[in-house]
Amino acid sequence: MPTAVNVAKQCLTAEASYALEEAVNVARRRGHSQTTSLHAISALLSLPTSVLRDACARVRNSAYSPRLQFKALDLCLSVSLDRIQSGHQLGSDDSPPVSNSLMAAIKRSQAHQRRLPENFRIYQEMSQSQNQNSLSCVKVELRQLILSILDDPVVSRVFGEAGFRSSELKLSIIRPVPHLLRYSSQQPLFLCNLTGNPEPNPVRWGFTVPSLNFNGDLDYRRISAVFTKDKGRNPLLVGVSAYGVLTSYLNSLEKNQTDGMILPTKLHGLTAVNIGSEISDQISVKFDKTYTDTRFHDLGKLAEQGSGPGLLLHYGDLRVFTNGEGNVPAANYIVNRISELLRRHGRRVWLIGATTSNEVYEKMMRRFPNVEKDWDLQLLTITSLKPCLPHNKSSLIGSFVPFGGFFSTTPSELKLPFSGFKTEITGPVSSISDQTQSTLPPWLQMTTRTDLNQKSSAKVVQTKEGLESVCGNKFTSSASASTCSAKSVTTDLNLRVSSVTTGSGLKKHLDSKDFSQPQSVSSYSFDNPRDLNAESFKIIYRRLTDMVSGQDEAARVISCALSQPPKSVTRRDVWLNLVGPDTVGKRRMSLVLAEIVYQSEHRFMAVDLGAAEQGMGGCDDPMRLRGKTMVDHIFEVMCRNPFCVVFLENIEKADEKLQMSLSKAIETGKFMDSHGREVGIGNTIFVMTSSSQGSATTTSYSEEKLLRVKGRQVEIRIETVSSLPMVRSVYGPTSVNKRKLMGLGNLQETKDTVESVKRLNRTTNGVLDLNLPAQETEIEEKYHCEENSNVWLMNLKNHKRLIEVPFKPFDFEGLAEKIKKSVKENFDKCVRSDCLLEVDPKIIERLLAAVYFSDSRKDIKELLENIMSPVFLRIKERYEITTSCVVKLVGRDLDIFLEDQMDLFFVKSQ
């Protein structure tokens, strides 16, 4: 039977009574006969200082905006209230009585409040004094009333439909986060979320209690103690804050800080190596067996030859190995390689990892039954609620633009092994491009830093002057002034403040770093993202010139663009326009750029807009483009992988939708798809190329010509001639290009003529359209379309954010001469050196294409030796070559295309 409102109020405090009165008003306005728990929830959410709404804001799903999820909650609540049947009309003085479910919630809260430890003594004294009236009328506080109402199944269903969990809300109300530790942009940590996170590296900002001690000395001692054991020497951290403890431990280990973690003496100098990010890429993105073998081979060499007690490998989260969406064979292979590494190098290799739940560990054991024994694992439970938020970390990426030092941390998947653990674990990424300074919370508004002293300021100025001399352009006055500014705002993607190292830290880094020592990988890690822009330039420039020869000027411009600080805090995207010939060099340099900045070649997306216009796919994976427009394909890839290099080839062929999206992206920092959805590009590098104009100099070789013959197999026919005066050696610079052997040149000319006649006949035999005005209209529309495209392209190229990178024509003639000399040397080595060799230009052309399209144009001698040595060995076996012989290699095209360059030539039988 319903309870009168006045009777129910006797059980509540003043604050709770006010909330109940508001719930009664909601029921009266809707014409309902009783006041239910849903009316109470509606009233509680509407209070000026709503504890329930504040709890919802902290446990909301970070995948949706707060406004969207609260609108969903209001909608679900309104629908549930509308389903309640209206009762008879009540008078103006009548109030809808409290329903049985709501009164039961009040009784439950009374009983729970009576059992609280802080209230137990008071109610015990009441019971001893036999004051039953006082005992029965326990005043229920508002917080306890909310907790009891959340237990109502109807209320739980409403919150569940809006994406909330009653258990999370209750825990959030019981343990409110203090103001100084509250991060409104992140989802708090709850035990019920631990097993439901599909991400490979679930990282959350801690839901903390102010009275807890965050000192990790005990956890550090426990981890170090496991390393010293003879059995079970590789710890696996399991717990809510396992990632935070692991990151702090490895940071201290990397900085050689033994205070607070009691590192044993025999472990001093232990080298920490991070392979977790690469394991995740190989299993979840794309598996490369050759790359994996090379990496583990390097790890083995580092374990054997490295100084100190050995190597500590951080393999990341066990969830990567057990995730059903990953590559299962790749996971099996990597697990076996880690086991093999431990067997080979014994006591010089340690392992460490972390996971948030024991269920993941059990799943790992079911999939790999021997891994606990092979890896010598020791479970280490982490019970302290250490914040998962690491301190300000940095890496080489921080010294690059598009980031320009504004990253305090980077996602773990962007880190290569051997680079340290400074930025391994961060919170979820959220864009700040559409936020202003005035709307930011107080802890994001400004952060002060210590003024630079005179000595440190001079050191910073000297570093900048060195960069100016290398790049050939000057810093603006505002950039120079910002060096000595008293305040600086450095907000990273996780909406947290990162401190800026002063000049003293820069000088310390300069004095301590020794870049002359050989490195195991081609990347470095700095102590601060703003350190050594000049050194960053050298690293980028060296990598680019090593991988792409003959384009030093282009490498210089790109290195300058990536080394300079960004003009805006919220815009770290870079736009490059590669102009000139050498299409292969442009693509290869962009790929190397992805490897340098994002530490992975899988973060490179290439789109050939010219091929897409002709209906030939235009991307590396044509199946993904099926049924989609090009702009939607690019948008999807950027949503899935915002840290990437987008390579747009033949940009002048872009359609109208892509033109609009690119124009908006370069202006606003948001890339839009065909449906109007947007994605931030603050961490993306756009590289655009256009079809190169024909150069004034005429050469025997061109990119188009080599592209047509790429991979086509050639049949080699050997002719031996004894007449010495009639032959020329391949050593002569003009002997190959000015001869036509066996009438092959005339045959090719005849074939081209026949094709021209066929095309002419097909054109003239078609049915003519006599509707001349329609034809003129089509021509006019096409002309206007091309004109608009040219205007758009001109405006894009003139944009201030777009950096023009000049490329020089590739020296095909010089490379051809090197190939001829290398072929002759190889022939002398395999056959004999006292006879002459004459090679068909067709064969030289195939070799030139093989070298030009290879991964490295510098290893010409080794590449040609692998291709031509089998050919010359067959010649030596099948023919009797004497001193007076002249060996002629005559080529004939076959309609066979091969990916393997080693089988490029087929030697015809005698």
Swiss-Prot record:
<comment type="similarity">
    <text>Belongs to the ClpA/ClpB family.</text>
</comment>
<feature type="region of interest" description="Repeat 1">
    <location>
        <begin position="12"/>
        <end position="84"/>
    </location>
</feature>
<dbReference type="GO" id="GO:0005524">
    <property type="term" value="F:ATP binding"/>
</dbReference>
<feature type="short sequence motif" description="EAR">
    <location>
        <begin position="768"/>
        <end position="772"/>
    </location>
</feature>
<dbReference type="InterPro" id="IPR036628">
    <property type="entry name" value="Clp_N_dom_sf"/>
</dbReference>
<dbReference type="InterPro" id="IPR051650">
    <property type="entry name" value="SL_signaling_regulator"/>
</dbReference>
<keyword id="KW-0832">Ubl conjugation</keyword>
<keyword id="KW-0805">Transcription regulation</keyword>
<keyword id="KW-0804">Transcription</keyword>
<dbReference type="GO" id="GO:1902347">
    <property type="term" value="P:response to strigolactone"/>
</dbReference>
<comment type="function">
    <text>Probable component of a transcriptional corepressor complex involved in branching control. Regulates cotyledon expansion and lateral root growth, but not germination or hypocotyl elongation. Promotes auxin transport and PIN1 accumulation in the stem and represses BRC1/TCP18 expression in axillary buds.</text>
</comment>
<dbReference type="Pfam" id="PF07724">
    <property type="entry name" value="AAA_2"/>
</dbReference>
<keyword id="KW-0677">Repeat</keyword>
<keyword id="KW-0539">Nucleus</keyword>
<feature type="compositionally biased region" description="Polar residues">
    <location>
        <begin position="515"/>
        <end position="524"/>
    </location>
</feature>
<feature type="domain" description="Clp R">
    <location>
        <begin position="7"/>
        <end position="179"/>
    </location>
</feature>
<protein>
    <recommendedName>
        <fullName>Protein SMAX1-LIKE 8</fullName>
    </recommendedName>
</protein>
<dbReference type="InterPro" id="IPR004176">
    <property type="entry name" value="Clp_R_dom"/>
</dbReference>
<dbReference type="GO" id="GO:0005634">
    <property type="term" value="C:nucleus"/>
</dbReference>
<dbReference type="InterPro" id="IPR027417">
    <property type="entry name" value="P-loop_NTPase"/>
</dbReference>
<feature type="region of interest" description="Disordered">
    <location>
        <begin position="504"/>
        <end position="524"/>
    </location>
</feature>
<feature type="region of interest" description="Repeat 2">
    <location>
        <begin position="98"/>
        <end position="179"/>
    </location>
</feature>
<dbReference type="InterPro" id="IPR003959">
    <property type="entry name" value="ATPase_AAA_core"/>
</dbReference>
<comment type="subunit">
    <text>Interacts with TPL/TPR in an EAR-motif dependent manner. Interacts with MAX2 and TPR2. Interacts with D14. The interaction with D14 occurs in the presence of (2'R) stereoisomers of strigolactones, but not (2'S) stereoisomers.</text>
</comment>
<dbReference type="GO" id="GO:0016887">
    <property type="term" value="F:ATP hydrolysis activity"/>
</dbReference>
